[in-house]
Design a protein with these regions (language model features):
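Alpha-helical interface subdomain recognition
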Residues: 1-26, 38-39, 43, 50-55, ...
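Flexible, small-/acidic-enriched active-site or ligand-binding loops
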Residues: 73, 126-155
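A short core secondary-structure module
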Residues: 85-130
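Short glycine/proline-enriched turns and hinge-like loops at secondary-structure junctions
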Residues: 2-4, 70-72, 98-102, 140-142, ...
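A short, Trp-centered hydrophobic/proline-enriched beta-strand micro-motif
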Residues: 54-62
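Beta-sandwich/jelly-roll carbohydrate-recognition scaffolds of carbohydrate-active enzymes
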Residues: 46, 65, 73-79, 94
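Long, acidic (Asp/Glu-rich), low-complexity accessory segments flanking structured domains
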Residues: 151-169
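Short Gly/Pro-enriched turn/cap motifs at secondary-structure boundaries
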Residues: 66-69, 95-98, 110, 136-143
Length: 274
């Protein structure tokens, strides 16, 4: 895989591509990373080649109508069947990116009432259905739908990680993505700046380009300063993450564990930059 700094650069470049960037990030980030970091070898062999090639797409189902920031208050439940071989999932998720075309869903549910856990659910599983596409203000080229689960039966091997440890998956994967969100916004800001400069040079008032006026120059200068500061902070944090992960990996920690621990250490910085 690519190092953290390269991923940061890719996120920066893709920033202006709103809908595509949203779809790509939801797939390669929160959609794939739970399997990469917490999946069994069987999970990885089954899903990652197809997800990595783009043959399959992934969606991350965490948010519910009554639980957004308070993700652990989810009401979606998963009950173990009497024979102990399957889980039956019932509940509702909303604002799910990629839902309209996802082949596999990362689904969080409560086992036994209060054991927050994570499951892999494939599209086409009986009882899984989708709501209509949301009428959004922007990123209209990205699929965003509700996902409904009505006694959706999955084999117990579809459990990601351990029962009751779903919060580790949910929050650690989100921690990895926090820096990317900031970088994507930076990339979009750079594109907006290019458009603003072009317009300022083309727009004529009082027989001259408005870019000659001090007020416009001041605004463009302020944008430049803020983008430079943001870029410096984001790429510095990216390097800190990379150095931390590499150090842990060199000392015997697996790649996945090293990246997660590095993300956890710098999660606050990443959240602030986002």
């Amino acid at each position: 895989g690519l190092d953290i700094n390269t991923n940061t650069l890719i996120s920066d470049v893709l920033g202006p591509m709103g809908s595509f960037n949203t779809t790509m990030a939801a797939h390669t980030g929160i959609g794939m990373l739970p399997i990469l970091y917490y999946g069994t070898e069987e999970h990885k062999k089954k899903y990652l080649p197809k997800l990595g090639s783009g043959e399959w797409k992934a969606a991350y189902c965490l948010t519910e109508p009554s639980s957004g920031s308070d993700a652990l208050a989810a009401k979606t439940v998963a009950h173990l069947t009497e024979d102990g071989a399957f889980y039956e999932i019932t509940g509702q998720k909303m604002w799910i990116s990629n839902a309209g075309f996802a082949d596999v869903f990362i689904v969080f549910a409560q086992v036994g009432g209060d054991k927050f856990s994570c499951f892999l659910v494939e599209q086409g599983t009986e009882g899984l259905s989708l709501g209509a596409e949301e009428d959004k203000l922007g990123i209209k080229g990205s699929s965003t739908r509700q996902v409904f689960f009505e006694n959706v039966k999955v084999h117990k091997s579809a459990l990601l990680g351990e029962v009751g440890k779903g919060h580790l998956i949910a929050f650690n994967v989100l921690n990895v993505g926090r820096l990317k969100l900031g970088v994507m916004a930076l990339g979009a800001a750079k594109r907006n700046f290019d458009v603003a400069v072009k317009y300022a040079n083309e727009r004529k008032q009082f027989k001259q380009s408005i870019s000659n006026f001090g007020a416009i120059q001041y605004k463009l200068a302020e944008q430049t300063i803020q983008m430079y500061a943001c870029e410096a902070a984001l790429y510095r944090t990216s390097m800190l993450l990379q150095q931390k992960a590499q150090s842990l990996h060199d000392n015997g920690m697996s790649f996945a564990e090293a990246k997660l621990e590095a993300a956890e250490e710098y999660a606050v910085e990443c959240a602030m930059l986002k």
